[in-house]
Structure formats: C-alpha cells, structure tokens
Curated annotation (Swiss-Prot):
InterPro entries hit by this protein: Snf7_fam (IPR005024)
Cellular location(s): Endosome membrane; Vacuole membrane
Keyword Membrane tagged: yes
Sequence segments annotated as region (Disordered): 186-229
Keyword field contains Transport: yes
Record region (Interaction with VTA1): 128-159
Pfam families from the UniProt entry: Snf7
Organism classification: Eukaryota, Fungi, Dikarya, Ascomycota, Saccharomycotina
Amino acid composition bias (Basic and acidic residues), ranges on this chain: 218-229
Topological relation to the membrane, as annotated: Peripheral membrane protein
Organism: Saccharomyces cerevisiae (strain ATCC 204508 / S288c)
Protein name from the UniProt record: Vacuolar protein-sorting-associated protein 60
Record's subunit section: Interacts with VTA1; the interaction occurs at he endosomal membrane.
Length: 229
C-alpha cells in the first residue's frame, strides 16, 4: 500500500541530499538552456531592428508599417529580457541553494567520518584495561627489586665464602712467616740462589755449590803442555 500511494521505504539523510543535489543540477541546466535560447531570440530581434532602422533612414521615416513592425519587435524583446532577468534570478537562487546543499553534504561527510573515527577509537581503547596495566607495571617493578636483592645476596655469599676459607690463626702464621723472609732482590746472578727465598725459586733453583776451576800457575801449565807433547 505504501508503494501504491507513494510512501515507500524511508530514505536516509544522505540519499535525500544526493537526490536534491541531482534535482538542483537538472533545474540549473534547464534554466541555463532557457536563458541561452532567450539570448539567441533577443539577438535576432536586435538584428531585425537594425535592418528596420536602416530602411527607415532611407525612407526618411515615411513608412508606418516599418515603425509598427519595429514597435512589435521592441515589445517582444522587452518581454524576453524580463523573462531572462527572472530566469537569471532563479538561476542565482538555485546556485545559492546548490552551494548550501554542497556545504551541508560536505558537513555530513565530515560528521560521518568523525563518528567512524570515534567508534574505532572507543573500540580500541575498550580493549585496554588501565587497572591491569597498572598491576602489570607494579609486578614488573617488584620483579626488578627482587632481581636486585638476589644480585646483592649472591655478591655477599661470594665475598663471605672467600673470607671464611682462611682462619685467623692461619692468617697470623702466614704473616709471621712473611715477616721473617727477606724479599730484597739480588743484584747479581751469582747471589740468586743464596738471597732469594726457597719457596720462590721452585724446581728451577740453581744448585747450592758450583765447582770452580783450579788456579794453576805458569809452571804447572808448562808441565802439562810438555807431558801432552
């Protein structure tokens, strides 16, 4: 029944704007065509009036028929000009309406884009739980503090283990032994084995004694040479 009586489905606001835009474009095009036709007719009437004027000048205004014809043409031209002025006013009104419609359509496009952006932002922010984010940050800080405490405990354990390996009695005995040793470095290679402590020489220490060559005087050397000959 609605279709029969012209009440179809309700159209959206965007569809109404598009249809009104199309109808105004068609109306403006029709007005432009009509104004162009009137301009052509007025130009033809002006050409006829020019010819009549030339004929009247030749006849010294002695032909009443030409004057009547010119008067009719002038009246017709005036009517056409009035029609053209009216159409120009209508065209200007249609142009203003078209501009208003275009602005409204652009505004609706902007509003729809803002609505879509707002909905998208709400959907994205809706997935974020600020309380959970804060809890996660607190947990991360706690884990960092626990890691720092663990490193401090490990460092303390390592240092205490090294100190606990040696007792106070052993430390005193070692210090006394070191005090009795002479750590003055020798000035020559011959005094290396005598002046350096034994525990610093190790397995590569030189022997405690060195055989020296006998001192032979000149006569003994000569006898040795004669016996050799």
């Amino acid at each position: 029944m609605n279709r029969i009586f012209g009440y179809g489905n309700k159209k959206s606001h965007d569809q109404l704007l598009q249809e009104s835009n199309q109808s105004m474009n068609q109306a403006q095009q029709s007005l432009s065509n009509r104004i162009s036709q009137l301009d052509t007719q007025i130009a033809q009437l002006n050409f006829q009036l020019q010819n009549i004027q030339k004929n009247l000048q030749r006849s010294n205004n002695k032909q009443p028929s030409l004057r009547k014809q010119a008067l009719k043409i002038l009246n017709k031209r005036k009517q056409l000009e009035n029609m053209k002025d009216s159409l120009d006013s209508q065209s200007w009104s249609m142009t203003q309406a078209q501009l208003t419609n275009d602005n409204l359509q652009n505004t609706m496009i902007t509003i729809n884009a803002l609505k879509q952006t707002n909905n998208a932002m709400k959907a994205q922010y809706g997935k974020i739980n600020i309380d959970k984010l804060q809890d996660m940050q607190d947990e991360m800080l706690d884990l960092i503090e626990q890691g720092d405490e663990l490193q401090e405990v490990l460092a303390m354990n390592n240092n205490s283990g090294e100190l606990d390996d040696i007792s106070d009695a052993e430390l005193d005995a070692e210090l006394d032994a070191l005090a009795q040793e002479d750590f003055t470095l020798p000035t020559s290679e011959n005094s290396l084995g005598n002046d350096m402590p034994s525990y610093l020489l190790g397995a590569n220490a030189p022997p405690a004694f060195i055989d020296e060559e006998p001192n032979l005087d000149t006569e003994d050397k000569n006898k040795a040479l004669e016996s050799a000959q």
